[in-house]
Amino acid sequence: MSDIALTVSVLALVAVVGLWIGNIKIRGVGLGIGGVLFGGIFIGHFAEQLGITLSAEMLHFIQEFGLILFVYTIGIQVGPGFFASLRVSGLRLNLFALGIVVMGGVVTAILHKLFEIPLPVVLGIFSGAVTNTPALGAGQQILRDLGIAPDVVDQMGMSYAMAYPFGICGILLTMWLVRVLFRINVDDEAKKHESAITNGHALIKTINIRVENPNLSNMAIQDVPILNSISIICSRLKRGDMLMVPSPGTVIQIGDLLHLVGQPGDLHSAQLVIGQEVETSLSTRGTDMRVERVVVTNEQVLGKKIRDLQVKERYDVVISRLNRAGVELVASPDASLQFGDILNLVGRPSSIDAVADMVGNAQQKLQQVQMLPVFIGIGLGVLLGSIPLYVPGFPVALKLGLAGGPLIMALILGRIGCIGKLYWFMPPSANLALRELGIVLFLSVVGLKSGGDFIDTLAHGEGISWIGYGFFITAVPLLTIGILARIFTNMNYLTLCGMLAGSMTDPPALAFANNLHATSGAAALSYATVYPLVMFLRIITPQLLAVLFWGMG
C-alpha cells in the first residue's frame, strides 16, 4: 500500500473510532468532537508499536487545511452577528468573557514561571484547559516560526490531550458550584430571563390604530414624521370596508385604521400622536390582498437598498418586515438586502408574485453552496494570516496565522454579505459539514502525532502534573468571574452558564447549560454573544504567550 493510501486509511480509522468515543455520554455529557483526539491517540499508540510509518508531509497538510476549514466556516457562521455582539447589549457579557481569557493567560504565565514547564507543554496545557482547538493550531504555528524542532512542537498536542477532558469537567463543575453557592433555582432564573426578554428587548410588534388627531386629516403619510421614519412601517390602511396598501403619498383621513409594524417603544409614540389602539382586525382574509414571505436569492438585487427596489411605486406592495439570520427587523428603506434575507410582503397576489420573481424566492438556492466565494475567502484569509506584525522587542513577528487569518477574513466577509454577484452566505447544513470535516481532520492528525508517547507520559512521566496545571487554568478564571458576575451584576444563572461555556468555546458545556432548562434559550443566546470575540482572543493568546515566554527565556 502506498504512503498516501495508508495515511488516508489510518485517518479514516481514527475518525471512526474518535467519533464513536465522542458519542459515548455519561449523565448526558460526552467528549463530542473532542473524542476524535483520543481516537487519534489510541490509533497512534498502536501504530507506533506496530512500526507503521505515515507520510509526515501529508499529515502536516491535512492538519493545517482542516484547521483552515474549521475557523473559516465558524467566521462565516457568526460573522453577521459578530459586530452586533460588540455593541452595548452584549458589552457586559463580552467584558466578563474577556476577563476569563486574560485571567487564564495570567494563570498560565504564573504556572510556567513557578514550575518551569517547557514552553510547548504549557501552551498545550493552556489550549486543552480552555478546550479550544484553534488555539492549539495557532500555538503550534508560532512555535515553528520561533524555530523549535518539530518533535518538540508535537509535545504541545500531547499536553493538550492531557488537559482537554478535565477542561470540560472544570467548566461543568464551575456551573454546579455557582448554583450551589448562591442556592439558585433554575426554573426561577428561566422565568426571570423570559420576563426580561419580554419587557426589555426591542422585539418587532404590530398595532392597529384609528386616526383621531385632527391635525393629521388630509395629510400624506410621508408628511407625518412618525410614519415617515425608518423605525415604523405602515403596511395596511383600512377605510370603511376597503383595505389597501398605503404609499408614502397616500392621504390619511379621520377614522382610517392603520396597521403599523415596529418596536414597542416606537409604536407607543405613534399611538400618542395618531390616536387610539383598536381591536378591529386588518386581516387580508376575504380581501383581494395577501401576506407572503419571500426569500432574497437573486444576485441582481444583492446589496441594493429597499428604497431602490421601488416595490410600492411599481407593484403596489409593501415590505413590512425583514428577517435576517433569524432576527426580525423593521424593513427600513435604507436596509441593504443580503442573500437569504426573508421579506414579509403585503399586496395583491399578482403583485406579490412579481416582487417574488424580482428578488428571486428560489428556495432551492438556499441549499446550494457557491464554492467560488469559499475559496476566495480562504485564500484572502491565508494571505491576511501571513502578514507579519513587527513589535519592538519581540524576537519574531506576530501573525494571525492559518487560524486567525481565515477567521478574521470570514468575519468580515460574513458581515459584508455580498460583493457584486459573490455572496458569502452558506447553508447551515453545508457550513456544519465543512466545519465538522475540518475539525475531524485536524484533531485526527494531532492525536496521531501525540499517540506514540501518550501512555508513557501519563503513566511514567509528568502527565498527572499536566492535568493538575490544566485544571487550575480552567477553574480559577471561571470560578472568579462567575462569582463576581453573580455578586456585582446579579447576572441570570442561565445567561451566566452560557457565557462561561462561550468563554471556553466549548459545545459540550453549552449542551450541558441548555439542558439545565430545556425550554429556555438564555444559555445559547449568551454563548453566541461572546463566542466570536472569544474565538479571536483564544487564537491570539497562545501566540502572545509564546512570544513573551520565549523573550523572557
Swiss-Prot record:
Source organism of this protein record: Enterobacter sp. (strain 638)
An individual GO BP term: potassium ion transport
Cellular localisation: Cell membrane
Membership in a protein family: Belongs to the AAE transporter (TC 2.A.81) family. YidE subfamily.
Transcription listed as a keyword: no
Keywords of this entry: Cell membrane, Membrane, Repeat, Transmembrane, Transmembrane helix, Transport
Record-linked NCBIfam families: PRK03818.1, YidE_YbjL_dupl
Molecular functions per Gene Ontology: monoatomic cation transmembrane transporter activity
Residues annotated as domain RCK C-terminal: 191-276, 279-361
InterPro entries, sorted: AAE_transporter (IPR050144), RCK_C (IPR006037), RCK_C_sf (IPR036721), Transpt_YidE_put (IPR023018), YidE_YbjL (IPR006512)
Protein name, per record: Putative transport protein Ent638_0015
GO annotations of cellular component type: plasma membrane
Membrane-crossing residue ranges in chain numbering: 4-24, 28-48, 65-85, 95-115, 158-178, 371-391, 403-425, 439-459, 464-484, 493-513, 533-553
